[in-house]
Amino acid sequence: MKKWLICSFVLVLLVSFTACSPSAEHESIKIGIAESDGAIWNYIAQKAEEAGLDIQLIPFSDYAESDIALANKEIDANAFQTISYFQSFTEKYKLNLAPLGTTYITPMGIYSKRYERIRDISRGAVVSVPDKAFDFGRALTVLQEAGLLTLKNGFNGTGSVDMIKDNPRHLKLKAVRQQDAVSGADVFVMKPSEAKKAGLNPKKHTLKSGGLMSEEEMNLIVVRAEDQDREALQTILELYQADDTAAFIEKEYQGDLVPAFLPLKRLSDWKNEFEH
């Protein structure tokens, strides 16, 4: 009986030591995200827990703050920005950040309750576009793709109305918050998810869809350059770029987001081209 009690006590100590040892603890990773991506990252977080990682999701509404927080080591990674935005922002503010891998592309379309076709848009029509800098730039490109205006050479996906070279219909661009997009405008340039929130019917009110499906508009997971090879972050990237994650995105977002997993080699080639 005494031997049994001693063995039991030793076993309890071993179990307690194992449970409390650093090797058994989950590594904590803080990731800054856009609130609209919560469903995806909750899915990733569940998978990460099985891999021994504890993902803490930090929502940001100001995208610039997310990059600054990453540079200041307040978070370990962020996932919200396109390649073109990342290039422009990090170059402007000299941040030592690096892309880890790509996630998805968000289509952007042209919608209207007043017009049925692009060619029907009248001279002087008011066009609402997103007020966030990089979405504003995307909207300009969508309008150019539709033949409604021409942008200056050197346009890199971000910028202001100063980048417009020709506006033959004299469209009046109105930069607004998403919730105000359909107020006082004839035409709206926005993402499908925003169009639905604004009460638009994609089948009835879409004049042009699927704009900006290029590599430069893929969204990224971004980390500090020194952490690019960090094992935990590489694991998170693998979990994100898995087939089951792509299937989840397609089912959950119904075309509002399109999975786009760029191989790391191609991302490195792009990064080298950007740096040189």
Swiss-Prot record:
Signal peptide stretch: 1-19
Keyword annotations: Cell membrane, Lipoprotein, Membrane, Palmitate, Signal
Superkingdom field: Bacteria
Cross-referenced SUPFAM superfamilies: Periplasmic binding protein-like II
Gene: yhcJ
Main location: membrane
Lipid-acceptor residues (S-diacylglycerol cysteine): 20
PANTHER family recorded: D-METHIONINE-BINDING LIPOPROTEIN METQ, LIPOPROTEIN
Organism from which the protein derives: Bacillus subtilis (strain 168)
Source lineage: Bacteria, Bacillati, Bacillota, Bacilli, Bacillales
Topology versus the membrane: Lipid-anchor
Name this polypeptide is given: Uncharacterized lipoprotein YhcJ
